[in-house]
Amino acid sequence: MNLRMKIRILLCGCGALALGALVARAADGVTKDGAPLRDALVQEASRPIKPAWRPMLLYLAELHGRSVFPATGHFKYPYESIGPGYQGGRVFGHIDLTHERFDTVRASPEHVRNQIRNELGGQQADGLIPGIVLFDAEGQPRWKNFKGFPPIWVVSAEVYVEQTGDVDFLNECLAAVRKQIGWFEAKRSVPGGGFYYLDLTANTWESGMDEGIRYDERPPAPAACVDACSHVYLLYDHAARWSKNLREPAADWEAKARALREFIRKELWDSETGFFFDQWTVRRPARRQLAFEGMWPVVVGAATAEQAQRVIDEHLLNPKEFFTPHPIATVALSEPKFELRMWRGPAWNCMTYWAARGCVRYGRRDAARQLLEKALDATAVEFGRTGTIWEFYHPSLGEQSLLRRKPTAQNTPSRDYLGHNPLFAMADLWRQAGGLPVK
């Protein structure tokens, strides 16, 4: 049976045959290196889900197939870009690549392992792992050698090992984590405790949250950022657990994780609002702003059980804040600075996925299921309206044309965007959280 026939069969009965033409056209651009990944994802799209989600998953499979290119530079394996529709052209890496690995690990574990190796292959002697990797006229990779990015890649490495049992791969990952920790400790530590991103001093957007509201008013000196602290805790925690798995000393990593966890719980938590904030605003009520980054201690497991439940119930599931018709809003609806621009309000599916992972971590499968189902429903509706996968979405199901990105020639969200849309992973976690029986 050829692929187009398989797609027609999968679309039968879901009232979406008209979208089959879109999927078929997308298939025309699939690369030689991307075809096996696309085929595996088409197969995954046949797993139990809501029928209304299947057309967008099949389209997403084609986008993955169009985004894999031959090995070049320090990439020893074919590499996957962040999507064919990104306005900046072909780009590799950043947090987008982690989301793509979440999306493809069940369909093609080998592809995920190779993308991790490609990413770690660019690690500098000082420990920095390149963030946004661009390509010059000859197709060779280049990046800024002073700017990092959130080190969430470790979670995708662990997911790969869980999927395959390839524990030996952790040797490569642990070596990279040790060096990356060294870079963060040398370059991004705050006197007195915690870590920060370079966004604190300039518009570098090292955090990946371009033009986020937290940096509208900056402190006079480096201070602990809630997201950076959470992400470095993630490094310490993984370094400790991987060391144990490989029968190597773990005590130092455990001690560092424990100390940073206590710092986050005590110094970045506000008991009045039941939310986490940056160090320079947490004790200043007039400066506190409800931005989604306050969920990160829950996502990484640094919050106490009580703190996590408050974040989930009072904020993530609050329809006046983050639980919008398309969740999650990146800035609470109740926040005066909420607007339909970039990370200042719109919904990004990748962050809904991270929020759901945090809910599951603290035993709230019910909350994860609600977040994921609502986001996938909304994404499917928008796919039916516009026939594409968007970089980010209107949190209240309004027209995408109302959204703004940055004041450039293309001040709208990118179309055909992979990096922030781990829809296969979201559907899988939804199943695990009780959405449908897992088969």
Segment roles from a protein language model:
Residues 2-12:
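Bacterial N-terminal signal peptides that target proteins for export
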Residues 12-21:
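Bacterial N-terminal signal peptides
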Residues 24-26:
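Boundary at the C-terminal end of the N-terminal hydrophobic targeting segment
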Residues 33, 37, 48, 52-60, ...:
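Extended, well-ordered alpha-helical scaffold segments
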Residues 40-91, 114-144, 189-223, 262-347, ...:
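Extended glycan-interaction surfaces of carbohydrate-active proteins
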Residues 90-123, 293-305, 352-365, 372-375:
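Alpha-helical support elements that line or immediately flank enzyme active sites
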Residues 92-121, 143-191, 221-238:
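Substrate-binding cleft of carbohydrate-active enzyme catalytic domains
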Residues 102-105, 155-162, 234-244, 299, ...:
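Short glycine/serine- and small hydrophobic-enriched flexible loop segments
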